Amino acid sequence: MDSLAGLVLCGVSLLLSATVDGAMDLILINSLPLVSDAETSLTCIASGWRPHEPITIGRDFEALMNQHQDPLEVTQDATREWAKKVVWKREKASKINGAYFCEGRVRGQAIRIRTMKMRQQASFLPATLTMTVDRGDNVNISFKKVLIKEEDAVIYKNGSFIHSVPRHEVPDILEVQVPHAQPQDAGVYSARYIGGNLFTSAFTRLIVRRCEAQKWGPECNRICTACMNNGICHEDTGECICPPGFMGRTCEKACEPHTFGRTCKERCSEPEGCKSFVFCLPDPYGCSCATGWKGLQCNEACQPGYYGPDCKLRCSCTNGEKCDRFQGCLCSPGRQGLQCEKEGVPRMTPKIEDLPDHIEVNSGKFNPICKASGWPRPANEEMTLVKPDGTVLRPKDFNHTGHLSVATFTINRILPPDSGVWVCSVNTVSGMVEKPFNISVKVLPKPLNAPKVIDTGHNFAVINISSEPYFGDGPIKSKKLLYKPVNHYEAWRHIQVTNEIVTLNYLEPRTEYELCVQLVRRGEGGEGHPGPVRRFTTASIGLPPPRGLSLLPKSQTTLNLTWQPIFPSSEDDFYVEVERRSVQMNSDQQNIKVPGNLTSVLLNNLHPREQYIVRARVNTKAQGEWSEDLIAWTLSDIVPPQPENIKIFNITDSSAVISWTILDGYSISAIIIRYKVQGKNEDQHIDVKIKNATITQYQLKGLEPQTVYQVDIFAENNIGSSNPTSSHELTTLSESQAPADLGGRKMLLIAILGSAGMTCLTVLLAFLIMLQLKRANVQRRMAQAFQNVREEPAVQFNSGTLALNRKAKNNPDPTIYPVLDWNDIKFQDVIGEGNFGQVLKARIKKDGLRMDAAIKRMKEYASKDDHRDFAGELEVLCKLGHHPNIINLLGACEHRGYLYLAIEYAPHGNLLDFLRKSRVLETDPAFAIANSTASTLSSQQLLHFAADVARGMDYLSQKQFIHRDLAARNILVGENYVAKIADFGLSRGQEVYVKKTMGRLPVRWMAIESLNYSVYTTNSDVWSYGVLLWEIVSLGGTPYCGMTCAELYEKLPQGYRLEKPLNCDDEVYDLMRQCWREKPYERPSFAQILVSLNRMLEERKTYVNTTLYEKFTYAGIDCSAEEAA
């Protein structure tokens, strides 16, 4: 717990450090704090270039509740642009007494400076207006008696009584002792006679640093910089707060007389300089006179030999150097130090060099440079850059060039909102200097329209690049036309263009290309984002390649190439040309001519264990187009080598994960994992056979706790099995202790159950009779409901095969699925339920291993269409195979005519509920406020969910499956918080699917073409993915909350889209908008979406802001609308 608190304090310290560095130079000047009949004022001054909200001056009711309530007349200071002022005329002297503050805000952080005013005719006067001490100091707060009265003296803290002195014991100096001061002792202390009031009270303010002397940090264990000239060490940052008249990292550098501020740029313009001005700075400094002045009114000059704020510093100059009451010892050339006690090169105030007043940059990466001179030369940690929002940047690179210190800063992504006044700041022992400069961030240009294809041939295309109009800033320096084949994983090619019409040459025949335009503006990083993509296909020059090509090993020296029958459109003679070449030996190449009426060819006389590349084309008098390359190995002539790199990890009390690697070229068809309890007979082992050789890890489940197992791994091919690997030991963890014996309670329970046994038995028998009657009634009603149906059953089962009776000309082959035995399923809890289906958690046994599973089944009232869709889900899962981002099939079971589908169990439920549970401001407001977060999920976790779904959908699209119901409710969150796509009941295996039946539709997730024409493609899945991404960013909000489905039908074709969530970065929302383009072919593919999300994850930028900010609200949830969809 202490470590956690330390981390939290450390985070707070870092935030405060950034705030102090980036804060405005805020100073409160209290003119004549002792009020008489003269005019008095408060002036609050801020640096003009600093980013801040308007500064304010007000009464400090936290310190004194019972002061005047009248609002202050705050006006703009006529002599300074960034200053506010309150002036009291002589006639309002009676309303002045009290505590006041000046406040400014930077990046939402408030900076408040406090001061007080009191009557000069008060009965007592404080020794000082403020007093700053370290934690643990012994403090005497003293008031000087001015008027003598026969009354008790009373002392208050923050308006509450704490102490009194009998009237005959009131001393000339009234003291309040605070031993071992702590932060809670800080506050405004006041003294008066008991018969007096606020207007006869004297005030002083005690400031207690959070740390002991010369310490700072969250745990007060770091040593402060040695602050000179009565500077104060800030307990949160370790930096020196310099008194008025001094500057620099250690406050050693004296300003010119009558100047003040962090960089000594402010000046007291009155004839007598800063006389009668009390300067108040942020805590823990408090208030003091400017250097050279002392007294409560700061109207007394320092005595000879003294200098500094309140004249508390003694010169003690060496070598007869002169003492100045404003600057201290004035050292002659060659001398330095507070007392001129050191020899050396005279110190020079830093100066910022070669920094232009205005810089124009392009959005993207930006590396500004600050150069500074001075002596000693500024160091790395002494140079900073302040953004317009107050963020302080440290140098990424630093070096010395001649007499200059050069600091290079890095902004990974600068955007137009970053335009404004930036400040280069240098703070050394020789002083501090800041120079503001203006940065104008330009938006990179992007064409609004896709290029137009004017003409195409088999190897060329004529393009109108349509570079105007464009979004963003000009002028345009150059233009690029980017293009590449659609189905090839290769980089974009580009050509520079000067005219609007350009010809692309040397293209591949009968190939689909995509192209777009990129505009470049002046300046570094001026390349804009590519514009909308246009696709086109070049013409053919010959017959297309054979369709359905397949290359499989036949023997150790033979490969079998097959294809679909060829039906050419012309009557010309044709043949199939097959080219075969070896990967290992470039010289081994053969071309074979196959008669056109054949659909296969055996490639003979090959070498065992060798990889070959094969392609084919259909030739007539002209040569046809080559097919894509097919690659296959011949079968091995030797047993495979042992699996390598065996690793066992993620060991629990009942499971462990084993991984391995295998060598290519040995025709490995299966991996066998053999394990047994150490010490048992060889015939008591368990074999797990993994027939997919591409799988390289497996989780053993159903192990006994705290048991040593012996594990061997074999590889198997057409020749036989490899030798086993050297045995590996696996020791499972111990199981958690069983609950303690209930003892007497258990016996009492048995007694109660025994005495009530007959009653329970009677109730049970009655219940069973009623259940049987109800079941008979249900069966009768079901028979009546379908008595007129003469069709065959929707689903037919037969020993591990599934046949769907569809109304089609050609019934497909039955689907083969992994069979589970009914007795190997142990049902546990219901975890989900709908109108016609139910999902239960179960413990199943598969391949001898026990594991958790989710079992899906249909209810008795489900229709034939529901049963057909459910069986279709099994068919889809069988065809899809295994992928980490889809819910994978474990097996299926037919029992009494019903299908039970076993899939992976996702312990964290569906993504929609998971997102809504993360809304911690609704579920645990105290935690949300304490941690300043609106969600238990980070930006990275949310983007990982989005990337997982995109990866799974890319796999589905490659398998040419359409999901049709992609939404957060149909995404499950598995182990290690991996998102997995589920609910394939509506999936189809065609490239384009037209829905012809009515039913409940997920309208809020459907693409325009699906709503209007009931057409579903992978592109319509992309639209749904964009809505799902919106659900993730909005933490489970309802899409189009507050709108009816009828309104959606009307507004979507008019260009209306989901609004950008407040916590969403522009780049993520732009990705959503791309998914919602009206023309399906203009939407990105899932592979492109995944590339964009992976780049965002690598940049580790906060693309989804889950920080709790002021007036934060979650996106709306309308469950009734979701059900209606």
Swiss-Prot record:
Concerning SMART domains, the annotation shows:
EGF, FN3, S_TKc, TyrKc
Q: Where is the Fibronectin type-III domain?
A: 447-541, 545-637, 642-735
List the GO cellular component terms: cytoplasm; cytoskeleton; extracellular region; focal adhesion; plasma membrane; receptor complex
Matching Gene3D superfamilies: Immunoglobulins, Phosphorylase Kinase, domain 1, Tie2 ligand-binding domain superfamily, Transferase(Phosphotransferase) domain 1
Q: List the disulfide bonds.
A: 44-102, 211-220, 224-233, 227-240, 242-251, 255-264, 268-274, 280-287, 289-298, 302-311, 315-323, 317-329, 331-340, 370-424
Topology with regard to the membrane? Single-pass type I membrane protein
What does the subunit comment say? Homodimer. Heterodimer with TIE1. Interacts with ANGPT1, ANGPT2 and ANGPT4. At cell-cell contacts in quiescent cells, forms a signaling complex composed of ANGPT1 plus TEK molecules from two adjoining cells. In the absence of endothelial cell-cell contacts, interaction with ANGPT1 mediates contacts with the extracellular matrix. Interacts (tyrosine phosphorylated) with TNIP2. Interacts (tyrosine phosphorylated) with SHC1 (via SH2 domain). Interacts with PTPRB; this promotes endothelial cell-cell adhesion. Interacts with DOK2, GRB2, GRB7, GRB14, PIK3R1 and PTPN11/SHP2.
Q: Which residues lie on this side of the membrane: Extracellular?
A: 23-748
The record's function comment reads: Tyrosine-protein kinase that acts as a cell-surface receptor for ANGPT1, ANGPT2 and ANGPT4 and regulates angiogenesis, endothelial cell survival, proliferation, migration, adhesion and cell spreading, reorganization of the actin cytoskeleton, but also maintenance of vascular quiescence. Has anti-inflammatory effects by preventing the leakage of pro-inflammatory plasma proteins and leukocytes from blood vessels. Required for normal angiogenesis and heart development during embryogenesis. Required for post-natal hematopoiesis.
Which residues are in the Ig-like C2-type domain? 44-123, 350-440
Domain EGF-like: start-end pairs: 210-252, 254-299, 301-341
Bilayer-spanning residue ranges: 749-769
Q: Where is the signal peptide?
A: 1-22
Query: What GO molecular functions are on record for this protein?
Result: ATP binding; transmembrane receptor protein tyrosine kinase activity
This chain's protein is named Angiopoietin-1 receptor
Glycan attachment points: 158
